[in-house]
Amino acid sequence: MTEPTTGKRRADAVRNVEAIVEAVLNGGIVGGELNMAAVARLAGVSRVTLYSHFPSRQSLVEAAVDRAIAESEQLVEELRLDLDPPPVALDRFVSSSWRMVDKYHSLYTAATTELPTGRLTALHGPLLGRMRTLILRGRRDGSFRTDLSVDWLVATAFSLMHQAAEEVEAGRLSARKAGSVISATLLPVLRRE
């Protein structure tokens, strides 16, 4: 008799966690800050329920970043970048990634406040790994430079993407043009001289 109740609670808990993370991604961050009361309200749960699943702002931001990155990974997977020459694949990767950075720019702002830099970078690991693979493929076919470390080039791409988000936030760069600006900046950095 207790198993169905436990199973129901687990299903409710899963639904609550999903609703809470969705609330963060869809309006729970205001002015770059996570508002726990707003998240609870948007998720349709009490603050007690919110804190029972996410005891800290950091844990909630981390879960939301993880979800946003999983969504980004799915989009990148659908691009089938291995079918394009590396420069074309890079442009498509940047364009797709930019759409996600722009969509979740408030989350990124909150994450830079709530999460240690190393943790934020680690959460981006799968996407950084895809960028690394793409750069290595470009090196093998002669499209991309070999005089700088791959780690440096990946870090440069990651930083450039997020700097563009800050420029958009500050009103110095159009969100609509940012993807092409990032590609126009990054491709010359990567190209073999």
Locate each region found by the language model.
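Alpha-helical DNA-contacting segments of helix-turn-helix folds
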Residues: L60-A68
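Helical hydrophobic small-molecule/effector-binding pocket
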Residues: D84-A111, T121-G125, G129-T133
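Hydrophobic alpha-helical connector segments
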Residues: A63, Q74-K103, P116, G179
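Hydrophobic/aromatic-rich alpha-helical bundle segments in the mid-to-C-terminal region
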Residues: Y108-T113, T121, G125, R140-A184
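A secondary-structure capping/hinge motif
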Residues: Q58-L60, S106
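Basic, helix-initiating cap at the start of DNA-binding domains
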Residues: M1-L42, S59
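Short hydrophobic/aromatic patch on the recognition helix
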Residues: G44-F54
